[in-house]
Amino acid sequence: MEGTMRCSANYVPLSPISFLERAAVVFGSRTSVVYGDIQYTWHQTRDRCVRLASALSDLGLSRHDVVAALAPNVPALCELYFGAPMAGAVLCVLNTTFDSQMLAMALEKTKPKVFFVDSEFLSVAEESLSLLSNIEEKPLIITITENPTEQSKYEQYEDFLSTGNPNFKPIRPVDECDPIALNFTSGTTSTPKCVVYSHRGAYLNATAVGVMNEMKPMPVYLCTVPMYHCSGWCYIWTVTAFGGVIVCLREVNDEVIFDSIVKHKVTNFGGSPPVLNMIANARDSVKKSFPWTVQVMSGGSSPPEVMLKLKKLGFKVMMAYGCSEVYGLGTACLWMPEWETLPEEESLRLKARDGLNHFAKEAVDVLDPTTMKSVPHDGKTIRVIALRGNTVMSGYFKDKEATEAAFRGGWYWSRDMGVIDPDGYIQFKDRSQDVITCGGEIVGSKEIEGILYSHPAVYDAGVVGRPDETLGESMCAFVKLKEGAEAREEEIIEFCKRKLGNKNMKMIPKTVVFSDVPKTPTGKIRKNVLRKMAKDMGYVQLRAVE
């Protein structure tokens, strides 16, 4: 428009780096990071991140070089989420559960210049590096240790940090769409892919996550989401923007969570359904009461019964749907005021859905992949969940073919199946390869898993299809009972019949297996393992449904 101009006065490329610069000024003397006896202020955190960026730059890193890290949720990772991009680099936090071969695959693909490794994972990191064959120069290893007197042949993190210049000028992105992070998918559907996040997407998603999780200024965030998973759902950047406290955890269990909430007066955290289930079913000796409500964002819907238990313990849980390709969280189940006037069972059912796109996503829909049209809003028609907007990945690193396949017709096509309810809210039903075809009808496992969770004796459950001579496939439930609890197969099946009422009888399990339910490190059920177990059981005859 005539008389206007873009200049440095009115345009700065969006980047989470801005959050840290502001936090050091506005919240400088306030606590930023807590980990055991370690405690920093925002002024100190900014200083440490600048020194880290300077030390990395002194190694001769070029813009967009990769810096890798393998560590639990410790302060060094928080600093790397700023220090690496402030050096112009791209951070890749690797999955701490990867074995040496998976790590070697990730390192060979990303070719990092520097590799920060927590001493707990040093042996597997060294083994993975020994497997590399196509990298001319292996990365420089810097060890993260909690014992400064620990002997190591590698330079330690704090020593490396001390070489940095506190007056270093952070490198900003030239374009806000420049890469800031690489994240490997969990690999539940295929070999893990490497997803590229941009400065712009990270900035927008971080702000959206804070609003979704009902964060207030200066929150206290418990770091329960692994930082290797979708950049920790962008929460490190979020809490920085809000001037809060990041409570780091080396391990996550129910006792640590309750103790941390009370000790640090935690206001917010994120968690997968298994984490929430663990909290809901914690032993009475572990549970602790607190006179405030803790806001929880769940990356996946939990059964209403679990939500009710959490509510009574002092947690307000908002459900969300997402994946690595959409920066972790792509939707949120925003609670409507009128839901509070409904009977509790109906209110919880509505709140247990996956919701709608948050304000940093342009749209979410359930589309027929052939017609490219939206499905009826009937809560029944199962098709593919698709999203688009500014917080969708830039693409798959070094995989143009996969990127083009994922971006079709102006949408990112997930590998997840869902439905749309009459009010427009999305419900995730199953992974595309996990849906069960019963008598020619596509059936998701999510609802029946929720029913199984509501059984008083059931601690965990996963449902897959088992070969069936009559239906093609029928429901096979793998159930883990609570400690000391007892239940028989017939009892579980009858319970599902009663709960389903007049709904689709094909959802009733024909087989119940009592066993552990294998999970990925991020809490997703390893359906491929369960499917093989069900297949190895052979065909089942259809039970008569009374």
Curated annotation (Swiss-Prot):
GO terms for molecular function: ligase activity. GO terms for biological process: fatty acid metabolic process. The keyword RNA-binding does not apply. Pfam families: AMP-binding (PF00501), AMP-binding_C (PF13193). Keywords: Fatty acid metabolism, Ligase, Lipid metabolism. Its EC number is 6.2.1.-. InterPro entries: AMP-bd_C, AMP-bd_C_sf, AMP-binding_CS, AMP-dep_synth/lig_dom, ANL_N_sf. Belongs to the ATP-dependent AMP-binding enzyme family. PANTHER family: ACYL-ACTIVATING ENZYME, BUTANOATE--COA LIGASE AAE1-RELATED. May act as an acid--thiol ligase that activates carboxylic acids by forming acyl-CoAs. This is Probable acyl-activating enzyme 21. It comes from Arabidopsis thaliana. The gene is AEE21.
